[in-house]
């Protein structure tokens, strides 16, 4: 299984706060509720490619 690097971007301010190792076999983008240091609160973060 191949692994690639991907970033998690805040949906509110757009900053890329987290980097993850994601499988290339997955077709849907990952969505997690994480803390954004720029917004100062927990927001939805989506995987960017």
UniProtKB/Swiss-Prot annotation:
Keywords: Ribonucleoprotein, Ribosomal protein. One of its GO terms (biological process) is translation. One of its GO terms (cellular component) is ribosome. Gene3D superfamilies: Ribosomal protein L33. SUPFAM superfamilies: Zn-binding ribosomal proteins. One of its GO terms (molecular function) is structural constituent of ribosome. It comes from the Bacteria. Pfam families: Ribosomal_L33. Belongs to the bacterial ribosomal protein bL33 family. This is Large ribosomal subunit protein bL33A. It comes from Lactobacillus gasseri (strain ATCC 33323 / DSM 20243 / BCRC 14619 / CIP 102991 / JCM 1131 / KCTC 3163 / NCIMB 11718 / NCTC 13722 / AM63).
């Amino acid at each position: 299984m191949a692994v690639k690097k991907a970033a998690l971007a805040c949906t509110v301010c757009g900053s890329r706060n987290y980097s993850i190792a994601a499988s290339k076999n997955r077709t849907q983008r990952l969505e997690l509720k994480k803390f954004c240091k720029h917004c100062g609160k927990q927001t939805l973060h989506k995987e960017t490619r």
